[in-house]
UniProtKB/Swiss-Prot annotation:
It is an enzyme of class 1 (oxidoreductase). Keywords: 4Fe-4S, Cytoplasm, Iron, Iron-sulfur, Metal-binding, Oxidoreductase. It comes from Halothermothrix orenii (strain H 168 / OCM 544 / DSM 9562). GO terms for molecular function: 4 iron, 4 sulfur cluster binding; hydroxylamine reductase activity; metal ion binding; peroxidase activity. This is Hydroxylamine reductase.
Length: 555
């Protein structure tokens, strides 16, 4: 079965994956994901119509959010799980459809008889039809490449928002306006009457809602676990069995730490879970050791050497090797065929991590990969607490430039660019980072400026919000109206759809001159790229030395 997917930075030949995803997903899974997104658009059509009649269904919004998250790169590779979610999508669509029809009947005194597009009506109880239909309704079903580019840019931004909204929801923070925009955006991708300008306006609104969603998640994280504090994180290991926690879900980490306390098992973070070491709430656990390994794409070698079980709370999962597959556990929206899955928590209860803990007790301690310490925890609250010191260093010329190098890491050798930029920036430049892009340079010894580390790590990719807050506060302190007048440059690395949401957030806030790499998105047509270049001065990365000179010159 053929497929077409170009949603991530590693799309084959920077055009698209057509046989199997570079990420490892099969054509079957890709087509099921396309069908699921198609059905979410149908659900959204009814949700939007119901909203016009004053009917708002929170459960529908929550389902769309969670389902969109499953389609993000490196989240779920399990076709059986997608079959079940698609069946659930039919049920959700019927429920919101019936609520709408009832409200319409009550208001108008007649039945609704408007013809709706296929995503609002198509149904089959034959699973084999799911695969054929998915192949039919993929991204190439939109013929005009510019319309397709704008629709997919919007869709991928929506996926990123959905991921952040789902994390907030798990921590009991939600916002109906976010759910409503996800529905509005999905419906817009089905509307053939929308002009390119109207779609572009929705893309910018997507950036606005991305800021709102990251702020909501920041509130959820900090209200539950405290504000991150500057913290030195241990990179070594202890001589006890361990559990490695990867992904982004702090609630899972919290419950695992509680359930492992006093059990003789250590807990380590991996990848995007590294920033958890900076939250005050987790520092009380003596068996919370530190961080093991690097960015997601190196996990095959690192998971093999960890020896104990690995808990994947969200992306990024790489198809596991046979040598350690039996030690991988997925939870939440993550899935892989044949890998053990920890079920969602019941209301008022914790997840049951006992299978993971029992497994760990039978395993050898981790093999040490490295040792030493790295600093984390420089989110907006921590940086603003020393704002006077930062401002003084800028005024005295000790800090000439802040360089935002947030985003994602990936496999491409071209990403060495970011390591070399960090190495070549002069000693009066400070790097602001968030997301796993940090692993390209966070272990370099770049020193500090008057006690301010030259790499300030704000946290996970969603903590790019902290970088926005820091920039806005600096603008306030320096009395500038335009954020682009600050001594801040942006050299962003992207990989998946959450990075698209972060990029759109920056564009909405008016940031110009962003360098985006290691390649421009395959899903953008030449005309859409031209619009982004003309309006926002987005540029591809170049040679390291030339880029560093330009960055320091504010270009």
């Amino acid at each position: 079965m053929s497929m077409f997917c170009f949603q991530c930075q590693e799309a084959a030949r920077n055009k698209g994956c057509t046989v199997r995803g570079v990420c490892g997903k099969t054509g079957d899974v890709a087509n099921l994901q396309d069908l699921l997104v198609y059905l979410l658009k149908g659900i959204s059509i009814y949700a939007e119509k119901a909203k016009e009649l004053g009917v708002v269904d929170r459960e529908t919004g929550a389902f769309i959010t969670r389902a969109l998250f499953t389609t993000i790169t490196n989240v779920n590779f399990d076709n059986k799980r997608f079959e079940e979610i698609i069946k659930e999508a039919f049920e959700v669509r019927d429920r919101i459809k019936n609520k709408f029809l009832k409200a319409y009947r009550e208001k108008n005194g007649e039945e609704f008889d408007e013809k709706l597009p296929g995503m609002a009506t198509w149904y089959s109880n034959d699973v084999s039809d799911f695969y054929a239909k998915g192949e039919e309704v993929g991204v190439l079903s939109t013929g005009d490449e510019d319309v397709r580019a704008l629709r997919e840019l919007l869709t991928y931004g929506l996926k990123g928002i959905a991921a952040y909204a789902e994390h907030a929801y798990i921590l009991e923070e939600e916002d109906q306006e976010i759910y409503s925009f996800l529905q509005e955006g999905l419906v817009a991708t089905t509307d053939n009457t929308l002009s390119a300008d109207e779609l572009t306006a929705l893309v910018m609104k997507c950036g606005e809602v991305a800021v709102k969603t990251m702020a909501l998640l920041d509130q959820a994280n900090t209200s539950n676990y405290g504000h991150p504090e500057p913290t030195q994180v241990n990179l070594g290991v202890r001589n006890r069995p361990g559990i490695l926690v990867s992904g982004h879900d702090l609630k899972d980490l919290e419950e695992l730490l509680e359930q492992t306390e006093g059990k003789g098992v250590d807990v380590y973070t991996h990848g995007e879970m590294l920033p958890a070491n900076a939250y005050p709430a987790f520092k009380k656990y003596d068996h919370f050791v530190g961080n093991y390994g690097n960015a997601w794409w190196q996990q095959k070698e690192e998971f093999e050497k960890f020896n104990g079980p690995i808990l994947m709370t969200t992306n990024c999962l790489v198809p596991p090797k046979d040598s350690y597959r039996d030690r991988v556990y997925t939870t939440n929206v993550v899935g892989f065929s044949g890998v053990k899955h920890i079920r969602d928590r019941k209301p008022g209860e914790q997840k049951d991590f006992s299978p993971v803990i029992e497994h760990a007790l039978k395993c050898d301690p981790p093999e040490e990969l490295e040792n030493g310490m790295i600093p984390v925890g420089f989110a907006h609250n921590a940086v603003m607490s020393v704002a006077d010191k930062v401002v003084e260093a800028v005024k005295q010329g000790k800090i000439k430039r802040f360089v935002v190098m947030a985003g994602c890491d990936g496999r491409h050798r071209s990403r060495d660019y970011y390591t070399n930029v960090a190495r070549n920036l002069p000693e009066d430049a400070v790097i602001l980072t968030a997301g796993c892009a940090k692993y390209r340079y966070n272990k370099l010894n770049l020193g500090d400026i008057d006690g301010i580390p030259r790499i300030l790590d704000a946290g996970q990719c969603n903590d790019s919000y902290s970088l926005v807050v820091i920039a806005q506060k600096l603008a306030e302190v320096f009395g500038v109206d335009d954020i682009n007048e600050l001594p801040i440059s942006y050299d962003i690395a992207w990989y998946e759809q959450k990075a698209v949401a972060v990029l759109l957030a920056l564009l909405y806030l008016g940031v110009k001159g962003i360098r985006l790499g290691p390649s421009l998105p395959a899903f953008l047509s030449p005309n859409v790229v031209k619009v982004l270049v003309d309006k926002f001065d987005i540029k591809p990365i170049g040679e390291v030395e030339e880029d560093v000179k330009a960055i320091m010159a504010g270009e």
